[in-house]
Amino acid sequence: RSFSMQKKLKLRNDVTFAVREYLIQNDFLEIATPILIKSTPEGARDFLVPSRMQPGKFYALPQSPQLFKQILMVSGFDRYFQIARCFRDEDLRGDRQLEHTQIDMELSFVSKEDVFKIIEGMLSYVFKKTLGIDIPLPFPRLSYQEAMDRYGSDKPDLRFDFSLQDFSSLAELGEFANFKETLKSGGVIKALVASGCADYSRKTISELEETARVYGAKGLAWMKVHEKGIEGGVSKFFESAKDRIIKELQAKPGDLILLLGDEWKTACTSLGAVRNKLGSLLSLKDKNLFRFAWVIDFPLFEWNQEENKWDPAHHMFTMPQERFLPNLEKDPGSVLGDLYDLVCNGLELASGSIRIHDPEIQKRIFSIVGFSEEQAQERFGFLL
């Protein structure tokens, strides 16, 4: 009964109405897809519903309308959407729950640029109509590699400027054994200059280190910049390189330099989490700002250490970028997909991809992720 909750529900209603209005004006058809479906491999566990009429058999609740909307495209419906209820049996998080509602859509015979134009237009229309806010278009684009290298996240918060920097070559100039060992084993050293944070106590720095450890880091090194150079933390190992460090990192007196060494992904995500924590501590996350971006050029596959095989990074129906098709099976880890995420203020708002429309390419993808021809035919024969 609170006014705050009523206001949010009213806004949700207005947003839903504006989405429908915009998409229908752009020749989309709203089509409802089944809720009780066959279980197919997706990103999370299915919720299962026992069948009364066929004892021992189960329906699954949809994690997304993925397969149905692909069938709609094949059937000649060029533009589809629905406000879809989705169900995923996964651990609860701040931005994850067992059921959610998503704006689901699919388009036929389009490029990535066409999709971006539709989504950007929809968000611009919805924000203006419901909140009176003008969103600058087009949205900036970051490759997955750039987002991870600069912000330590594939859903970066762009409301503040702190950027990760590569410290690997500078680490070679120092005498810090841990960093040299990391580099020798093929890892990287990342740096983050926290402007004006040199007055942070060891207790506060230890809290930042704990944030990094949550993401797999072994520790967090630091040094402070003052008028005559650097001091504290690991500064004694870099005394001979202090001027070059300050110059290349563009640090200034009063700054805190945070350093982290590990294999590339762990180093990026761990220091990225520290960056995010600093954004909160320094009140840099303005709730009245909306900073959108497209993250593109994601890897198509990721290595599953436990099962010793390749898994799809998103799902199995994403088209590889054309330049990788000749050597798809030789080096799956290097293959980039035609997929993209829309992010805003550190949150992933949307995810999409260009779908595979060639059954031979689809069979090759199934083979790489471990499906035999028989298994692929049994599970996805209706699609192939």
Region locations from a protein language model:
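Class II aminoacyl-tRNA synthetase catalytic cores and aaRS-like
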Residues: 1-384
